[in-house]
């Protein structure tokens, strides 16, 4: 027998004798459970946490056999029944022991409130933060925290409204109802303006230099009227071919013209439109829009006003416990089943072997929890906190998958769940909401010519910065107590201290042509902004001395922007065609789309860092939505033509989302999970554009890796956080201004405007290489490198002497490569196509090339920084 035949016989015998896997079919063996599971004697798999927990989860009780008596850890509280729970759950107002002993009066009556807390009374074990007293909300179960509060006393520079609310004295007699009860506009004398001011028709005053400058500063545009200026104001906006220009100056998509939904501020896109009628196969909503007829009464609000789901009838009338559906299709009352009379055409209501038999009497019907006997047959049910994973077996419900079931942190337990709060928050037992501990949170928003603040608890309403021109974007560095805003008229970004009563502000960044939004990186001390005119996203240091384009391609109408310096990502919206929300590293790498479907006009975005979600407003769809930070798990929070008529910007804090609506000129708030509990916080605004929450917990502290080992990370220009994709991701990378590349050392900058000339000199036989650079920005010193390369004499015969040796070397190399190719074909190989893996491994191989001693940051060797900056130049 030949060698090949022997090998074949040996392989056949090995296959026949090889033991089969335990999960193979046809062996009769039980399926193998996961390492995190326990296998019952009957083969069922349960989570390992349920073994020896005192509760029989296997039908045969095998999970509670041979169990050693459990001992609680030192950090646990021992319940009276022996159960262990974390000590922090003791006396928190929520019974966690099955016997409730963690909340017993014996355990909790001696509870001592911590510093900065107050007791809810002699007969209460509840403690609340001092800042929650007299905040207008009942936080104690007894409501004692809101008793004997008295009237709020306003400061000398504030006005007390009839309702007791405090507002800035600058709001009194300004022609707007800022108290919301009109008391700030009572008994007002006719307003007068200064010698160098112009009085608008609304009685407000503006500098005389702002009149007839083609920029309406009066809310009624009287400073640019034909009567005042002798001409119509010149509208400088020029829209691209895919857009139309509104009468009020802005640009919108052509396809939005005459679609029944006003998108222009003045509604000019819906003027002189032909009357619309829906096709026969369509349903006409009450607002005049058309949807496909199949979408009517489908259980989903397809019309913005929800009229497609009104007066819908349930076509299936055979629902509920009092009905029985025959196999032949009829629907009869359950009382007619097993009454020895034919009510179904096929006699399916009178099965001989199933009527008057209680299957639950034998082995509980095979049900793991509850067996319910029915007139015909039976059904299995589960205890609270459990659900059927098949028709008989109950498994734990993961309640934490339900949005909003907990305010912040949800811990899934067997048959239930536990809610907790993040650091800096405390749970309000009355509402279950995690509320911030410390100073009162407030909303700060732009109002065109000023910046205002309203407290979220006491509703104090004041003016922070006044005498501005056209404020459109806003953010803050809360730790530094600084505000940053962009002014459209002055094409610049400004800064001011939030507690500066004088109102001084400084121009930080100039030549910002059409700033749509700004976002402050509070960890690395930089600022990001979108520019709708130049179609760019830029980044700069907070003092404005160093700046660059981060992205200047594939942007149509960049709008809102948000940053997460803790993970190194920046997010922005773009309402161009096609509209989308994108995500990228804050250093300009790893750009990718986040939301691309069912999105039309994403005006505002904001991040919920605690829940790791992104929220956005769609002004065209009149919708507030959210996704996780990978673009998954999309949810619609609110859809409303009334409260989301033309939303512009939004922000999130605790369990509330707040937004500005441009058409209603108001600030609204709602529950961020459900969109319920709608409330109006401020109205009668004047072209408000942006809004933020001001509280220390909005910007969690983080480590600035650029200052960890050396100043600015050793970078010559900008040091920017890198996206934290995996454990191998660098903490930061160096970045250069537009027109410059990062050198191989990963730190220094080199001009991309380099020209190379060759000049041959007979005397030295060398070629001179000279570099000519363009304009060098401040702070960048680019040195010109000149090298000499020896040129061999012409006509030399030295090359002929080494030619045989060269041919021999080439033959040896060729033979080696052929051997390598043969060896490669006879080896097992593994392909790694995952781009993240490829990028990571390439980085690991190149991490130490030309890098300083700090190991936390480096450039991306696998993705050339040079080519990226070339694209941005």
From Swiss-Prot:
Stretches forming LDL-receptor class B repeats: 439-480, 481-524, 525-567, 568-611, 612-654, 655-697
Gene Ontology MF term list: apolipoprotein binding; calcium ion binding; calcium-dependent protein binding; cargo receptor activity; low-density lipoprotein particle receptor activity; reelin receptor activity; very-low-density lipoprotein particle binding; very-low-density lipoprotein particle receptor activity
Membrane topology: Single-pass type I membrane protein
Effect ascribed to mutating residue 96 to A: Complete loss of entry of Semliki virus into the cell
Segments of this protein annotated with the region (Microbial infection) Interaction with Semliki virus spike glycoprotein E1: 117-139
Organism superkingdom: Eukaryota
Signal peptide (residue range): 1-27
Record-annotated EGF-like domain positions: 356-395, 396-435, 702-750
Main location group: membrane
Disease connection: Cerebellar ataxia, impaired intellectual development, and dysequilibrium syndrome 1: An autosomal recessive, congenital, non-progressive cerebellar ataxia associated with disturbed equilibrium, delayed ambulation, intellectual disability, cerebellar hypoplasia and mild cerebral gyral simplification. Additional features include short stature, strabismus, pes planus and, rarely, seizures.
Subunit relationships: Homooligomer. Binds to the extracellular matrix protein Reelin/RELN. Interacts with LRP8. Interacts with LDLRAP1. Interacts with SNX17. Interacts with DAB1. Interacts with PCSK9. Interacts with PAFAH1B3 and PAFAH1B2, the catalytic complex of (PAF-AH (I)) heterotetrameric enzyme; these interactions may modulate the Reelin pathway. Interacts with STX5; this interaction mediates VLDLR translocation from the endoplasmic reticulum to the plasma membrane. Interacts with CLU.
Protein's name according to its UniProt entry: Very low-density lipoprotein receptor
